[in-house]
Amino acid sequence: MKTSMFLTLTGLVLLFVDCYASESEEKEFPKELLSSIFAADSDFKVEERGCLGDKCDYNNGCCSGYVCSRTWKWCVLAGPWRR
C-alpha cells in the first residue's frame, strides 16, 4: 500500500515536471531540474569508501582500516580473519 502510494505520487510529480517543461521555452529545463534534484553532494562521500578495491602493493599502503591483500593485490577491510 505504501509503495503504490509512493509510486503514484512520484508519477504525478514527474508528470507535472514534464507538463511544465513542455510549456516552458527552455528545452533543457527537465534535465537541469532532475540533475539538481539527484545531484550527489560531495560532503556525504567518505574517503575510505574510495580505498576499497584500490590496487596496492606493500610499498603503496591503503587507507586506515584497510590492508593490502596478498592474493589479489588490492585494498580489503582489515579484520581478525585476515592474516
From Swiss-Prot:
Which organism was this protein described from?
Cyriopagopus schmidti (Chinese bird spider)
Propeptide found at 22-49
Q: What is this protein called?
A: U5-theraphotoxin-Hs1a 4
Q: Can you tell me which residues the record assigns to a coiled coil?
A: none
Q: What is known of its domains?
A: The presence of a 'disulfide through disulfide knot' structurally defines this protein as a knottin.
Q: What are the UniProt keywords, alphabetically?
A: Cleavage on pair of basic residues, Disulfide bond, Knottin, Lectin, Secreted, Signal, Toxin
Report the sequence similarity comment from the record: Belongs to the neurotoxin 10 (Hwtx-1) family. 51 (Hntx-8) subfamily. Hntx-8 sub-subfamily.
The primary site where this protein sits is secreted
Show which residues constitute the signal peptide.
1-21
Q: Quote the cellular component terms of the Gene Ontology held in the record.
A: extracellular region
PROSITE patterns named in the record: HWTX_1
> What are the protein's GO molecular function terms?
carbohydrate binding; ion channel inhibitor activity; toxin activity
What would be one Pfam family of this protein?
Toxin_12
Q: Name the InterPro entries for this protein.
A: Huwentoxin-1, Huwentoxin_CS1
Q: In which compartments does the protein localize?
A: Secreted
**Disulfide bonds, which pairs?**
C51-C63, C56-C68, C62-C75
Q: In which tissues is it expressed?
A: Expressed by the venom gland.
- Protein function: Agglutinates erythrocytes.
